[in-house]
Structure formats: C-alpha cells, structure tokens
C-alpha cells in the first residue's frame, strides 16, 4: 500500500512570538493557583568564565578537557553568598510557598496572590484560541522588583512568555532528488552502524513551547521500516503525552535516536524559553552530554520570547543566556542549535522588503557558545541504482536518494533556506577568526557592509542534510525539511565521538566549537566543502541580499558537512 506523501514544512521550529493574538484573556487568575518564576541575580567574574572556557576547550591547551562541575562555574559567577541568601530570605519572609537558592538564580513557586502583591503586577488566565484545552497564567503589564532586593536582580523570568502553538504547513512533494532515511545519512557521511556506544554517552532532544511530544508506536514503525534498533527514550523531563505526537518532536527523536544508535536518549520539554531551560539544565544531576535545540528566533526580538519588561532589552536577555550557555559548555555538555530556515533575511524580514534590516541573526543559533548547524540538500539522483540488497524496506516504497553531491538547502528546490550570517550582539570569537578572515578575502560577493557586522560571530559552524527526510507520524510516512533535521543528526555524530573518548578513558568533547575550527584548520577535507548555492531566499521571496557559499567557511553552510572517519581520526589525536 502506498504511504501518505505529504511534504511538511517543519524546518527550524521558529516561533511566531508576536503571538499574544493567539491567546484570549479569560479573566484574573485565581489567587491560589501556583506558578514558578526565576529571579536572575546579578553576576560577576564573567571575563574569567569566558577565558576559562576558551582555555579548556582549546585542543592545543594543556588544560584541554579539564571540564568543571556545575558548582564550580556557578560559584565563579554568582554574587557573594550573603547576597543570594539575602534575596532568598526576603522572598521566604514574604511568604513564598517554595524558595530555591541556586546562587546566581533564585527559583520561587508561589500562589498568584503572592506574585501579584510582591511584584506589583496582575496575572490572568489566557486560553489558546484554537487549542482551547491549553490554558496558561501570565502577567498583563509590567512588574516591579521590591526595593529591598532590586539592586541584586537583573530580571524576573516566567511572567510574560506566550507560547506559539503551530501546526506544520503541508504540501505535496515529488521527491525527485530522493528521500532521506537513516541508511542514506550513514552512507553519505561514513558513519559506522556498529560503532561501540559507551553507556554514559547521551543525547538530549529539547522542545520548547510545552506542547511537543512523540508517539512510541511511530518509533516502532520507523525502526521496522528502516531496519534499525528502535529508539528508547530513557529520560523524560517536562510534560509528555504520546497520544498527540507532533512533527518537530517526532523528527528529533527518530533521527537523533537513529543516527546515535544505542546512545542514551533524553527528551526534554520546556514551556518557557532559553534562559529558563539553561538554568534548569545546570541544576540537573548527571545531565546529558549532547543537547540538540531545533528552535530559534531573531536576536533583536528576544523580548518577544523572553522576559523583557520594563528596562530589560533583547541584548541583555541574550547576554545573560549566553553566560548560562558558557557554564553548560564548561561542565562537559555540547550545545547544538539550528541556524534558521528563512535564509539570511530571516524572520526579521520574511517578505524581503525591509530597508532598515534586510539581514537577520537568530538566537540561539548565532550564539558563540553553541555549535550552530545549517542545512544542505542532495543534487539530482545518480544514474546508478543503489544495491537493493543493502536498502532497508522503506526504500522499496519510497525512492531513497542515491546522490552524493551536496548543495546549499534553499528555496525553491527545498521548502526552506538554511539560515546564516553574523550575530547582531556577539563579538566574533577567537576560535573562528582565521576561517572568517579567509571568507572575506575570498572575493565572494558580499551584502552591503552596512547590513551586517563583519566583526561579530559568524554562523553556522557546520551543516548536514536538511531536505526530504522521511518520518513516521501517526501511522504514516511524511516528508520534512529544515535545520530541525540537520541539527539532531550532527548532535548524534557528536555523541558518537563522545563514545570514542569515553571508551578510551577520556572526557567528553563538551564545548566543541573550537575543536571544529581547529580540525578544519588542520585538514579542510575533514568536512565536505559546500560551494554551490546561497541563502538569499525566505519562504515568501528571494532577496538581493544574502550570502553565497564558497570554498572554506562561509555564513551559509559553515565549514561544511562531516566526513566521519576523518573527524574521528582528528578526535583520536586529542588528549
């Protein structure tokens, strides 16, 4: 029987966070309802944290791989102990139900009445207009931090986020260049299917918006049709309901789990945004070693997703969250983030008509403290058929790709265009100086210099396939495009490299971005160089502004896609 052939425009799980219109205010929240908020305390020694992380992640340093504990990095940047205790004690005296002092953040669970009185704000019930079962409590208006603690608090998180609940848009797809299944990925990048997985190697698929889940029956079907071991999620953090699977979570778990083989899999759902996730992660015992985040939103618009009210700005939110990302890298975890699905114009200019800001950056994909992942696609099929005996059953019903030539993933050939460019806020880190300088010296055409900051962090760092993936969803197979596909795949590759190191008594890769550039500098053929294509198009239009792929690193596909055997060989040389 022919399976359902729908092409899902999933891509990066971007957030339409001008989303207040999606929610209907239902009146004041009941006084006894409990909610959780976070007081972000003013930090110190941030320059020391950055220097330390760059030192222990430099493969040429004598300190390489000497990762820290969460307690060590938190104590480094936290305010004086008496300050955090003063804030926590004040909140306890005010009558909060539960107060947890994490040194540079105080987490409070309290009834609505307490929060309204303490922060001089008003809380309301909001009901989603289409998914009416979804009801949240949020503030309407500003808030005021009590004078007794105001000088020690940067902002309060958890009051203003309005989740964007979206259904994937669909389109019938021809799949003329062949479909992507785990078999194709293993073959293209040379990933062995019998790689010795260490029991402590782990990968975490993170979903935001608190409305994400996968279905275990879909995992069984996916494994059977692909002749692979069924992915088992052994750690679940946050809400999970397998009865209402969605495309994003399904893609992450099926491909992150499949390519990582038998690596321990975590599934983590978050109602709020990046700062909230990062602080919870840092306070988790024995957290996963690799984290894949297929979500993002324009850097200058973080106040639409984060907790900016009153004097806070998107810049301040990004800076503070980047500190938390540095801490995560320093304790031994690799963070990966998607580079976006709306090309260089991004979600700031999806209709390609902005004269003020024709190019966009994305967060966390443009953070210097995550491994930013772009997307490629394969060219037309080769004339020679693949060996039928080697193909899994799924390739009998669907024409799996046999091409080995990668191009930039871009509209109109694909349903998304890989994002890339330069951060609005973060300076260019030293680990990519040489690669970015070579790009500017290459002679490749550039956008007007007034439209981007060449001195800032360039992204993405790497890429992987992001077009024509097949996933099992609600009993059928469907197609998916996006950096939401490439990110968990590269995360799985990092998990394999971690297994090698752990099997040999070495620490995990952790903050692996400097390693990528040092590997590239030592031998550019460790990566497949993508030199055809650009990222000038969005879903709705193609702009005259954007970046072109060229030899070496570029703000389209980074240094390229992995040649696993060569990347492993480089990792094998490290202490």
Curated annotation (Swiss-Prot):
Question: What Enzyme Commission number(s) does the record list for this chain?
Answer: 3.4.21.103
Documented activity regulation: Inhibited by diisopropylfluorophosphate (DFP) and diazoacetyl-D,L-norleucine methyl ester (DAN).
Q: Which GO terms describe its molecular function?
A: metal ion binding; serine-type endopeptidase activity; tripeptidyl-peptidase activity
Glycosylation sites noted in the Swiss-Prot or TrEMBL record: 200, 262, 307, 380, 453
Q: What are the residue boundaries of the Peptidase S53 domain, all occurrences included?
A: 179-574
* SUPFAM superfamilies according to UniProt: Protease propeptides/inhibitors, Subtilisin-like
Q: So what does this thing catalyse?
A: Milk clotting activity. Preferential cleavage of 8-Gly-|-Ser-9 in B chain of insulin most rapidly, followed by 11-Leu-|-Val-12, 19-Cys(SO(3)H)-|-Gly and 24-Phe-|-Phe-25. No action on Ac-Phe-Tyr(I)2
**Domain of life according to the entry:** Eukaryota
Show the InterPro entries listed in the entry.
Peptidase_S8/S53_dom (IPR000209), Peptidase_S8/S53_dom_sf (IPR036852), Peptidase_S8_Ser-AS (IPR023828), S53_propep (IPR015366), Sedolisin_dom (IPR030400), Tripeptidyl-peptidase_I (IPR050819)
Residues holding Ca(2+): 529-530, 552, 554
**Prosegment location in residue numbers:** 19-173
Q: Where is this site: DNA-binding?
A: 529
Residues in the active site? Answer: 248, 252, 484
Details of cofactor binding: Binds 1 Ca(2+) ion per subunit.
One GO BP annotation here? proteolysis
The known PTMs are summarized as: Autocatalytically processed. N-glycosylated.
Q: Where is the signal peptide?
A: 1-18
Q: What cofactor is needed?
A: Ca(2+)
Recite the UniProt keywords alphabetically. Answer: Calcium, Glycoprotein, Hydrolase, Metal-binding, Protease, Serine protease, Signal, Zymogen
Tell me how activity varies with pH: Optimum pH is 1.7 with hemoglogin as substrate.
The protein's enzyme class: hydrolase
Q: Which PANTHER family match?
A: PEPTIDASE S53 DOMAIN-CONTAINING PROTEIN, PROTEASE S8 TRIPEPTIDYL PEPTIDASE I CLN2
Q: What is this protein called?
A: Physarolisin
Q: What is the scientific name of the source organism?
A: Physarum polycephalum (Slime mold)
């Amino acid at each position: 029987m022919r399976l359902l052939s729908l092409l899902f425009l999933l891509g990066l799980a971007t957030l339409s966070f001008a989303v207040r219109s999606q929610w209907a205010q239902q009146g004041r929240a009941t006084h006894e309802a409990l909610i959780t908020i976070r007081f972000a305390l003013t930090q110190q020694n941030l320059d020391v944290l950055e220097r330390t992380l760059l030192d222990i992640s430099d493969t040429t340093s004598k300190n390489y791989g000497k990762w820290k504990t969460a307690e060590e990095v938190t104590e480094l940047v936290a305010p004086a102990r008496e300050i955090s205790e003063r804030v926590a004690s004040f909140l306890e005296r005010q009558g909060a139900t539960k107060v947890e002092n994490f040194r540079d953040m105080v987490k409070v669970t309290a009834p609505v009445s307490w929060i309204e009185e303490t922060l001089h704000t008003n809380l309301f019930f909001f009901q989603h207009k289409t998914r009416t079962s979804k009801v949240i409590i949020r503030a309407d208006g500003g808030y005021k931090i009590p004078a007794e603690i105001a000088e020690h608090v940067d902002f309060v998180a958890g009051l203003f986020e309005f989740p964007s609940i979206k259904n994937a848009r669909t389109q019938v797809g021809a799949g003329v260049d062949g479909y992507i299944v785990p078999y194709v990925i293993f073959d293209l990048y040379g990933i062995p299917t019998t790689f010795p997985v260490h029991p402590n190697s782990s990968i975490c698929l993170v979903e935001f918006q608190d409305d994400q889940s996968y279905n275990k029956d879909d995992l069984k079907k996916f494994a059977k049709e692909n002749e692979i071991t069924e992915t088992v999620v052994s750690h679940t953090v946050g809400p999970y309901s397998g009865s209402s699977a969605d495309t994003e979570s399904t893609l992450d778990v099926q491909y992150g789990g499949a390519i990582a083989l038998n690596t321990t899999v975590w599934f983590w759902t978050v109602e709020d945004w990046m700062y909230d996730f990062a602080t919870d992660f840092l306070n988790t015992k024995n957290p996963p070693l690799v984290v894949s985040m297929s979500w993002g939103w324009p850097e200058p618009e973080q106040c639409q997703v984060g907790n900016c009210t009153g004097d806070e700005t998107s810049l301040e939110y990004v800076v503070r969250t980047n500190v938390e990302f540095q801490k995560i890298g320093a304790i031994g975890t690799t963070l990966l983030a998607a580079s976006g699905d709306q090309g260089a114009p991004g979600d700031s200019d999806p209709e390609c008509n902005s004269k003020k800001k024709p190019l966009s950056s994305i967060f966390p994909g443009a953070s210097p403290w995550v491994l930013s992942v772009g997307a490629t696609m394969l060219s037309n099929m080769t004339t020679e058929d693949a060996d039928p005996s080697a193909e899994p059953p799924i390739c009998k019903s669907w024409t799996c790709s046999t091409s080995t030539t990668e191009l930039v993933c871009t509209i109109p050939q694909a349903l998304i265009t890989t994002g890339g460019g330069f951060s609005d806020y973060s300076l260019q880190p030293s680990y990519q100086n040489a690669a970015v300088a070579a790009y500017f010296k290459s002679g490749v055409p550039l956008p007007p210099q007034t439209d981007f900051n060449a001195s800032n962090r360039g992204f993405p760092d790497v890429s992987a396939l992001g077009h024509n993936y097949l996933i099992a969803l609600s009993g059928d197979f469907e197609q998916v495009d996006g950096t939401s596909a490439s990110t968990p795949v590269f995360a799985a590759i990092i998990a394999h490299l971690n297994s090698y190191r752990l099997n040999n008594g070495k620490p995990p890769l952790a903050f692996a971005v400097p390693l990528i550039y040092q590997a590239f500098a030592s031998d550019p053929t460790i990566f497949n160089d993508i030199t055809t294509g650009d990222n000038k198009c969005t879903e709705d239009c193609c702009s005259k502004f954007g970046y072109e792929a060229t030899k070496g690193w570029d703000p389209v596909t980074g240094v390229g896609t992995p040649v696993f055997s060569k990347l492993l060989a480089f990792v094998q040389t490290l202490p």
